[in-house]
C-alpha cells in the first residue's frame, strides 16, 4: 500500500488496438483495497473510460480481485479491463504462471496468458451462453437506432439478448454501411434496454461473405458515454449468437470482431464459443493490452465506509 493513503498508482493502457489511435483506453488502479463504489465511479468519470480496481481476493484460490467501473455504476464484468489488469500485473512481476484465477462480482474467472517477445496475449474465459426469450421486434430496434426502415435489419437472423456474463442485445444488420450510419436516440435506446433487461445494444454486420469477420458497434446503457470502442463482453455474446444461429456446428467457433472504427479507435477482438448438442457451453475472448503510462493519482474524497473487495450485488446491470 502506498505511503499516502489518498494516493494510488494508476497504469494507463489501451486494449484490442488495431492500428494507430485504436483500442479501448483502460486505467488500472493498483492497491485499491478500501476504495468505495463512489470513488470508483468518480475515477471512471475523471478518466472517461472503464476503470479497473485491483483488490485483494477473499477466495483462497484467487490470486487477486478486480472491480470494474464506468462513470455511472459498477459492472459485473469487463473483459478488456481484465486483459489490461493481467497485462499490468504481469509487467510488475506479480503474475508468473498461467492460468490465473481472478475474483469478480460474478465469481471466479480463469484467465490464460502467453508471452510473445515483449508482449503477452490474454484469453479471458466467460460463461455458458444464455439466450433471452423476451426480445424487442425489428421495428422497435430500428426506431432507437435511427434506421428509417426495419428492413435494414436482417430477417433471417433473430434479434436476441445474449449473456455470457452480462446481457447484450445482438442486432443483425444488412451491411457495414448501415452499421456505420447508425445515429441512435440514446434516451429511447436506454429505455428499450430497461424494458428488456439488457445492458446495451450490439448491432453487427458481416465484413465479407464466407469469412468469420464481423464489424460491430456497442451502445451501452447509461454508462456515462454513448459508445464503446471495443467490448469484450459484447463480442463474446456475439460469438455465442453466431455459433448458435449462424454457424450451427459443434466444437469451437472463432470469430474476429472489428469495432471502434466510426469512433476513430480501430479495434480487433477474437471471440470464441464452444457449441455442443444445441447449446453454447463455453466462451472466451482473446486480445492484447499496451501499457501507455503510469501516474500517481489523488483519490476522490470518501466520506463513507465500504469494503473495497468484490461483493455480490454490488454491480448494477
Task: Give the label of every model feature segment.
Residues 1-77, 83-317:
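Active-site proximal loop and beta-alpha junction motif in alpha/beta enzyme cores
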